[in-house]
UniProtKB/Swiss-Prot annotation:
It is an enzyme of class 6 (ligase). Belongs to the class-I aminoacyl-tRNA synthetase family. The lineage of its organism: Bacteria, Pseudomonadati, Pseudomonadota, Alphaproteobacteria, Rickettsiales. It is found in: Cytoplasm. Its EC number is 6.1.1.6. This is Lysine--tRNA ligase. It comes from Rickettsia peacockii (strain Rustic). It comes from the Bacteria. One of its GO terms (biological process) is lysyl-tRNA aminoacylation. It holds the Pfam family tRNA-synt_1f. InterPro entries: aa-tRNA-synth_I_codon-bd_sub2, aa-tRNA-synth_I_CS, aa_tRNA-synth_I_cd-bd_sf, Lys-tRNA-ligase, Rossmann-like_a/b/a_fold. It catalyses: tRNA(Lys) + L-lysine + ATP = L-lysyl-tRNA(Lys) + AMP + diphosphate. ATP binds at residue 293.
Length: 522
């Protein structure tokens, strides 16, 4: 075994941990189908949200980690449940009243409310595929509608009929009495209306491959379970799909956790082997509620990319997948700055094992670009924007160029993008909420001390020396907690409760400019 393999197999980075589980489940053997299958799922009832991107990004991290541990071929499929009947109408789509007329219809049988594709489901699928393509994911797209209608699941659907009693014995204890009386794993597609029916099944015939139900008029209707004439309820469908496609690895949100045992048992009943599974925690909105495609209560991918590079979004997805995280606009600056820190550490680190533990290794699948920001962070640029209120990024570059003469927009495109992002973020989220603290007499003494200190130092003074001088002024002012001291300075000078290390900020903003800012508050 190579040293690289040894470092990878010992790594505690979660993608490698998951990859080792897959390798162990295979006993090192190539599956009969010739590859290891990774599956992600998508419910196209509403527009894809950032959680959909997150699941695919995480899945690829595990896939690439597995490829580092093994030379067994891999395949990633994105499976769209587009044959599901419409249960609720999303609030963030055009013409919701029109869509409401098609309740219980398969998503691929509803007209496209956006007027671009052959159906509502096709439109949602296209949106998913376009942004997966945009970010370079290599995947095969599977449509539930196509799989059912093309007969890909026919063999398994006949087996569900053959194992009908066993599956019902598994499922019924999970329901209330009222639901037990009507439940069946099969949902016929009504020959007249095309709706997905949740009706009691009066008769099932494995030999004929049919189920029989009563329509509203009391007539017995017999339909084949194959060829797209029936769909399985979502829990049996999950397990059936694992067995039919021979899925080796699947991850899903915590909302699936209670049913994971059922998925696995149904897969076994149908002769399959359940995949290795990872349950990730859900993203929460600003109110602590689960984000939802139908509600549209989350940041979209386009929203995030308006204010930050894609790598910061990938870092958010990488970090602690089994921990619930609040996903709103205020998490963006922190993730940008953490990405910069991890990137710099990666390129300073010579120990391969430590590189494997660095999130950027998994974000970039081992091919990590080197970025240079000269110590300038996104947060620092936001604060610089706050004091100079620039109309465009050229104003920020005026300060950046004085701080680091070797930096230019052409030679440092990452920093150039950050400057543009910072102005957008400031205008949309900070500017309207600035609230300045009027300095008290005590504050004015402090400000005068800072002004005197700035007048005495040379322009070449290092940031740490300036920071220490400001720190000493706070100590002399008699604050019990210096956090309160810095908070007061941020409120007086920047109009916000938090701010940068002032030594670094003053070096970027300039000593003379900072003197003018302080004088303005005196």
């Amino acid at each position: 075994m190579s040293e690289i393999w040894e470092d990878a197999i010992k790594s505690n980075a979660w993608p490698f941990v998951e990859a080792k589980k897959i390798l162990d489940s295979l006993n090192g053997q190539i599956p009969e189908k010739g590859y290891v299958l990774f599956e992600t799922g998508y419910g196209p009832s509403g527009l894809p949200h950032i959680g959909t991107f997150g699941e695919n990004a995480r899945m690829v991290m595990v896939q690439k980690a597995f490829e580092q541990l093994s030379d067994i071929p891999t395949k990633l499929i994105c499976f769209s449940d587009d044959m599901d009947g419409l249960r609720t109408v999303p609030s963030n789509i055009p013409n919701p009243e029109m869509v409401a007329q098609y309740m219980d219809m398969p998503l691929t049988s509803i007209p496209d409310t956006f007027g671009e594709c052959e159906s509502y489901g096709h439109y949602m699928n296209a949106k998913l595929r376009s942004f997966l393509d945009k970010f370079g994911f290599e995947y095969a797209f599977y449509s539930s509608t196509n799989c059912y209608k093309a007969g890909m699941f026919d063999e398994m659907l006949i087996m569900v009929l053959e194992k009908y009693d066993e599956i019902m014995e598994l499922m019924l204890p999970t329901f209330r009495e009222e639901r037990k009386a009507t439940y069946s794993p099969f949902m016929p597609i009504c020959p007249k209306t095309g709706k997905v029916l949740q009706v009691p099944i009066e008769k099932w015939d494995a030999k004929a491959g049919t189920v029989t139900y009563k329509d509203k008029a009391g007539n017995y209707i017999e339909v084949p379970v194959t060829g797209g004439h029936c769909k399985l309820q979502w829990k049996p469908d999950f397990g059936m799909r694992w067995a039919a496609l021979k899925v080796d690895y699947e991850m899903y949100g915590k909302d699936h956790l209670a049913n994971a045992r059922l998925y696995s048992e149904i897969c076994r009943i149908l002769g399959g082997k359940p995949p290795v599974q990872l349950c990730y925690e859900l993203f929460l909105d600003e109110n602590g509620e689960k984000i939802s495609k139908s509600k549209g209560n989350s940041i979209s991918i386009d929203d995030w990319l308006k204010y930050a590079p894609v790598e910061s979004m990938a870092l958010f997805m990488y970090q602690n997948p089994t921990r619930a995280k609040r996903l709103f606009f205020d998490v963006i600056p922190k993730n940008v700055d953490e990405y910069i820190t991890f990137n710099q550490k990666y390129h300073l680190e010579e120990d391969r094992a430590k590189r494997f533990a660095n999130p950027v290794y998994h974000i970039h699948h081992g091919n990590v670009p080197k970025i240079e920001t000269f110590g300038i962070t996104y947060s620092l640029l936001l604060n610089l924007t706050s004091v100079c209120n620039p109309s465009d990024k050229s104003v920020l570059w005026g300060f950046i160029s004085k701080y680091e003469p070797n930096a230019t927009p052409n030679t440092n495109p990452y920093l150039d993008h950050l400057a543009e992002f910072a102005i957008r973020y400031y205008n949309d989220f900070i500017k309207a909420h600035k609230s300045y603290l009027s300095p008290s007499e005590k504050h004015k003494v402090i400000l005068q001390d800072i002004l005197d200190m700035l007048s005495d130092i040379a322009d070449q003074t290092e940031a740490e020396a300036i920071q220490k001088a400001i720190y000493d002024i706070g100590m002399k002012a008699g604050y019990e907690n210096l956090r309160d001291y810095f908070k007061d300075l941020y409120q007086i000078l920047l109009g916000q409760n938090e701010g940068p290390r002032l030594g670094t900020f003053i070096k970027l903003y300039g000593v003379q400019e900072m003197k003018k800012l302080v004088e303005g508050q005196l």
